[in-house]
Curated annotation (Swiss-Prot):
Disordered: annotated span: 132-176, 609-767
Family: Belongs to the DEAD box helicase family. DDX55/SPB4 subfamily.
Domain Helicase ATP-binding: 59-291
Biased composition (Acidic residues): 140-160
Ranges where the Helicase C-terminal domain occurs: 330-507
Protein name listed in UniProt: ATP-dependent rRNA helicase SPB4
Coiled coil start-end: 654-746
């Protein structure tokens, strides 16, 4: 029988620390059964004196060996809600796990989230080791006290009260040492790193880690090894379970579940529940208890109205409306205003800006890095998306997490431009403002994006930018989804709230012209702008809420102005409007092929490629195309789903091109083509020779006396007889090939080779 406890919290302006947040649910010492002392000690050292509702509801159930399905708002403390039960279940085992046995498995959708969970586990395991050292020291001290007591008893009777106190102290020490069933450690198993699957297996074999944390693909590969024993597995955790399914890991999860024992505890943790997730619950869990933690208003206006929210009470959700051509300028002004002391938040130090595509992140990061007004305010920019190499992605993420404000005042804010790769589960500390330049194509991602701020009781603001018109219906849609949005003003160039000008915003137009100037002098900016615009339009056409975000009602010319394009790309979405005369855009009257790269190395490569393409034959041009394909493969090795499937079409095509470059084509197509060309040239030479011979014969016939009819008749008879003999010979040869044995076949082949050689020597019949 499953239950659905719902913990309510009040919405008020609470303090900025978890220990005094308005949504606390009691002290850790009130949990039943009680937690291990070193776990409570570390929580106290970290300043987490109070539990959050999701922790208070989940930990007792999970530790009591019940399967749980936990749905809670972002930033509510779900990580500790499963890390602590995992540690408790392993620490309370009666026997210690062997080196090749796995005790717990934690699956996450991305490398960054897996690394974050791993760091939390390492922190607790270090506390365990420290507590074990203290227990050993206490045991040694007790043994010394016991020896002293025995020596004292040999001289005189012992005081009864002192003896009782010593025995109690010894029992306490024995209690600490009795749990020396220590957890061996944790291991991180993710793709995109220098470690290969074989390295993962060797590390597990050598270290004997009890807990595995990683992404589905690499975990499945490791668990499939014969040397890894899963029979002793105690607990399985699927963090951000709905995201695991969205990224296409369904089959990986099914195979992982098939490798694990049935008698285990399983926990699913997510901020949203889906139908696909319900199917996974049916397959992988046994009589689960569902825990749903909601945020509700302190005073309900009516008993018939559901005032519960899907976002934290300390989060302020806002929306801004503007025309498409003013959107880029508004983004710059929002960053400047929210990081200034005049903002409601008192000056944001960290902001996150979400875009739909990787190409947009690359383009706007490059452009905003050169915008003078942001540089004057010393705004630090970072870019993060799924097509970056794993090393660059990790470096950028770590740098942003570690970044701090330069000075107090209206300067020094850190801004991360990213895609949804940073929308789920990641604990980005001290993020004050989230800006969604593009609403997510999947509406379920909206709350996850907003949840990067207002975490653990902190205040935060989330702003979504919408185009004036049909997109305004998105506000009503989110209200139905229990995520109310409040209006955010249109900002002027002086960062004051005003009504959007009916005509062009002069300051926004100046920003557009300045970015156009960058594109006219740097081909990299020009190409990035085209790719970003195309990717944005394509993403817009695939929006799940197409009844709100309609491509036919999108102002494509206004969007092009927001991207500061100096020319429109050639794409079907534009051609139909251009032919109908509904799309008018002022392109720059320049020769686009003459725009150089500002990077001298890239410009030299481009010039060499242009000169080479004009001189080299088609085969060389094809080779350069193959080189370009290789470059594209190198640039796109990494993607949002962290474990690339080895049998995907992209991987097969990439491997085929690599094989062709290294060893040539796998088939004999090139050899057959060369043979056909040689035969074609041979036949052409033969035709030329025959024509020459025919011309000479006709010339000689004019000067020779005519032969009589009898000679002509004899020649015709001889020719017909020769043709008949050839036909009969071919029939005999065919019969011989069908009926002869191997020896005859070999003899025939040698004769045929000799005949073929003679035929090559005398290609035509001479009378």
């Amino acid at each position: 029988m499953s239950a659905e406890p719902s913990v309510q919290t009040t919405s008020s302006s609470g303090p900025t620390e978890l220990r005094s947040a308005p949504s606390y649910a009691g002290s850790w010492t009130k949990l039943t059964p009680p937690l291990t002392p070193w776990v409570v000690s570390l929580l106290s050292d970290l300043g987490f004196g109070q539990m959050t509702p999701v922790q208070a509801s989940t930990i007792p159930l999970f530790v009591s060996h019940k399967d749980v399905v936990v749905e809670a708002v972002t930033g509510s403390g779900k990580t500790l809600a499963f890390v602590i039960p995992v540690l408790e279940m392993l620490a309370r085992r009666t026997t210690r796990l062997k080196k090749d046995e796995v005790g717990a498995l934690i699956v996450s959708p991305t490398r960054e989230l897996a690394e974050q969970i791993y760091k939390v586990l390492v922190m607790f395991l270090d506390a365990q080791n420290h507590a074990h050292v203290q227990a050993q020291q206490q045991q040694d001290q007790d043994e010394q006290d016991e020896q002293d007591e025995q020596e004292a008893q040999s001289d005189s009777d012992t005081d009864p009260d002192a003896s009782t106190a010593l025995n109690n102290k010894r029992k306490s020490s024995n209690h600490l040492v009795a749990r020396k069933n220590m957890i061996s450690g944790a291991q991180l198993v993710v793709g995109g790193s220098k470690c290969t699957p074989l390295d993962d297996y060797r590390q597990l074999r050598d270290s004997g880690a009890d807990i595995l944390v990683g992404t589905p693909g690499r975990l499945e590969e490791l668990l499939s090894k014969k040397g890894v024993k899963k029979s002793s597995l105690e607990v399985l955790v699927l963090d951000e379970a709905d995201r695991l399914l969205d990224l296409g890991f369904t089959e990986n999860l099914r195979r992982i579940l098939s490798l694990l024992p049935k008698q285990r505890r399983t926990g699913l943790f997510s901020a949203t529940m889906t139908d696909a997730l319900s199917e996974l619950v049916r397959i992988g869990l046994r009589n689960p208890v569902r825990v749903v933690v909601k945020v509700e208003a302190k005073h309900k206006t009516s008993s018939s109205i559901d005032d519960s929210r899907r976002t934290p009470a300390t989060l302020q959700n806002l929306y801004q409306l503007c025309r498409a051509q003013n959107k880029l300028a508004q983004l710059a002004r929002i960053v400047l205003f929210e990081s200034s002391q005049n903002a409601i938040s008192g000056g944001a130090r960290k902001l996150i800006v979400y875009f739909s595509t990787c190409a947009q992140v690359n383009y706007f990061y490059s452009v905003f890095s050169q915008v003078s007004i942001l540089r004057q305010h010393r705004v630090k920019l970072y870019a993060l998306h799924g097509k970056q190499t794993p090393s660059k992605r990790k470096s950028m993420f770590d740098t942003f997490v570690a970044s701090t404000a330069l000075d107090s005042g209206a300067s020094g804010a850190s801004v991360l431009f990213c895609t949804d790769v940073a929308a789920r589960g990641l604990d980005l500390p001290d993020v004050d403002v989230v800006v969604q330049y593009d609403p997510p194509t999947d509406p379920k991602v909206f709350s996850h994006r907003c949840g990067r701020t207002a975490r653990a009781g902190r205040n935060g603001r989330a702003i979504v930018m919408l185009h004036t018109g049909r997109e305004q219906d998105f506000v009503s849609y989110m209200r139905v989804k229990r995520i109310p949005l409040s209006p955010y003003p249109y900002l002027s160039s002086t960062l004051h709230g005003i009504l959007e000008p009916a005509e062009d915003d002069a300051s926004a137009h100046d920003l557009e012209l300045s970015i156009r100037d960058l594109a006219k002098t740097d081909r990299e900016i020009f190409e990035l702008s085209i790719r970003a615009y195309v990717s944005y339009v394509r993403a817009y056409t695939k929006h799940e809420m197409s009844y709100i975000f309609r491509i036919n009602e999108l102002d494509l010319a206004g969007v092009a102005r927001a991207f500061a394009l100096i020319r429109l790309p050639s794409m079907p979405e534009l051609k139909s409007r251009q032919s109908a005369g509904t799309l008018i855009y002022n392109q720059e009257p320049i020769d686009f092929s003459s725009i150089p790269f500002k990077d001298k190395a890239k410009q030299r490569i481009r010039l060499a490629k242009l000169s080479g393409d004009q001189a080299k034959p088609p085969a060389r041009i094809k080779a350069s195309v193959d080189d370009a394909a290789q470059l594209q493969d190198d640039q796109c090795d990494s993607h949002d789903s962290d474990d690339a499937h080895p049998n995907s079409s992209a991987t097969r095509a990439k491997n085929k091109r690599k094989l062709e470059r290294e060893k040539g084509a796998w088939s004999a197509q090139k050899e057959r083509k060369q043979a056909r060309l040689a035969n074609r040239e041979k036949r052409a030479r033969k035709r030329t020779f025959l024509k020459t011979q025919a011309a000479e014969s006709s010339s000689n016939a004019k000067h020779e006396p005519p032969q009589d009819d009898h000679d002509e008749h004899d020649w015709n008879d001889d020719y017909r007889k020769l043709q008949k003999d050839k036909r009969q010979q071919r029939q005999r040869n065919k019969a011989d090939r069908a009926n002869s044995d191997n020896d005859d076949a070999m003899h025939f082949n040698s004769d045929s080779d000799a005949a073929a050689a003679n035929a090559d020597a005398e290609p035509f019949f001479v009378i």
